[in-house]
Amino acid sequence: MNQAKSSQAIAEALRADICLNRGIEDGMLHEVALAQRFGVSRTPIRQALQRLAYERMIAVKSGVGSVITPLEDTKRADDIRAAVAIIEAAAKCAPPHPVPPVHFMSIVGILGMMDICELNRAEDFFDIRARLLAALADMIENPILSDAFRAAYWRLIRWSILDLATAPQHQAAHLRELLQSAARTMKTAT
């Protein structure tokens, strides 16, 4: 049994399970089984599931339960366009002051982690992507945009992990380029 006390820690573990497609054969997240797995009551499980629903990783269906939101090839381009639009909106709403050095150091730290990770391993790739999401979302001061960014970026993470299976070098290079670009942009803005 994996002990996790907070709903945030439970949500993090479930995000990893969803993104890495592990241990969820039927596409459902069952409250009772999750409560047993994490050694908690159903209250923190419900809170974690509520957060995942807010991020559009799952859908809570009356009489059915919590269902993982599927990735549909026909909606992939829409998912990407939505993420781009949210990123552009966040940039337009960014405050005029320079990025605090702590944010720059966070991105540089993630870049350093890439050098010691095996990015062709889905778990390592997921960890780097999840850290990048957290770092970028923390920079977005508008809470509505930050939440929208998180939902859209989790979707992109799921797509990129699918692509990792067939094109690991391309995905790793793209991730490194993204992080380097973010670091350069932040360095010139500080």
Task: Report residues per predicted region.
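Conserved amphipathic alpha-helical segments that form helical-bundle/coiled-coil interaction surfaces
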Residues: 100-163, 175, 190
